[in-house]
Amino acid sequence: MEIRRRPPNPSIKVANLEYAIPHPDSKPKNILEEIVWEKHLEVEIARKKVSLEDLKKKIKDLPKTKNFIDALRNSNSKPALISEIKKASPSRGIIREDFDAKMIGKMYQEGGANCISVLTDKKFFQGGFDVLVEVRKEIIIPILCKDFILYPYQLYQARAAGADAALLIAAILTDSDLKYLSKVAEHLGLTILVEVHDSEELERVLNINVFNLIGINNRNLKSFKTDLEVTKKLAKNYANQIKENSITLVSESGLFNREDLDLVKSYGADAVLVGESLMSQEDILGGVKKLVGNL
């Protein structure tokens, strides 16, 4: 699935006036492309407000990052649990009206989650780096910054906000992008969770051979439907390479109960990322405890 970067609009001058001409490909082809195009603008605005140098200065005063992978590998419950904080999504709209990120983070931690994922995308998920900052103040377990990262600047934003790990999505990045961003992340002490949706993306990531934490997203990017068979297929077909490279495998999306977790564990998943099903529950604390087998 090709995700294009936003094409620039050409312009013409008439007298002393300049007019923008709509580009023939100026409309995104799908929701993921729309998010990527919007992200370009979001980052441009952020750079004008806070310079890279300012982020670097802030990072210097921060403590060392927590080991995200160790937190998953050392989990007493299997598969390990990454609980996600998100207020909204393109497929669901508002997921939780009474959204208190700090309280949700504390309930996740108390319930037994090994790590927490925080959505920082503003327009489509109603998140933000300010949300990550607030959650970081309340919890001690590792935090993943989940966003549509295109530029090194965003990794600096994540680190400055208190993240220990960051998401890279193979579908929106070239091999060169993945390699370069992974080096920047390593420099910042951030663990990278690289996300794939199909065999083509997984092969790309395995061939790059720098990632030891891979997420398989069970959500179809075109239909937005979820199917746990995606984890089954990819984990089985690439089991040898995953084992040989000591890769920790995370199953993402479409997971609602303990039975789902046990199923993807049997497919080869070492950890799961669960968001919407927890955010939708009245009793979040009880929901987490059920997933990790403490209730």
Curated annotation (Swiss-Prot):
Keywords: Amino-acid biosynthesis, Aromatic amino acid biosynthesis, Decarboxylase, Lyase, Tryptophan biosynthesis. Its EC number is 4.1.1.48. Pathway: Amino-acid biosynthesis; L-tryptophan biosynthesis; L-tryptophan from chorismate: step 4/5. One of its GO terms (molecular function) is indole-3-glycerol-phosphate synthase activity. GO terms for biological process: L-tryptophan biosynthetic process. It holds the Pfam family IGPS. It comes from the Bacteria. It catalyses: 1-(2-carboxyphenylamino)-1-deoxy-D-ribulose 5-phosphate + H(+) = (1S,2R)-1-C-(indol-3-yl)glycerol 3-phosphate + CO2 + H2O. CDD domains: IGPS. Belongs to the TrpC family. This is Indole-3-glycerol phosphate synthase. It comes from Prochlorococcus marinus (strain NATL1A).
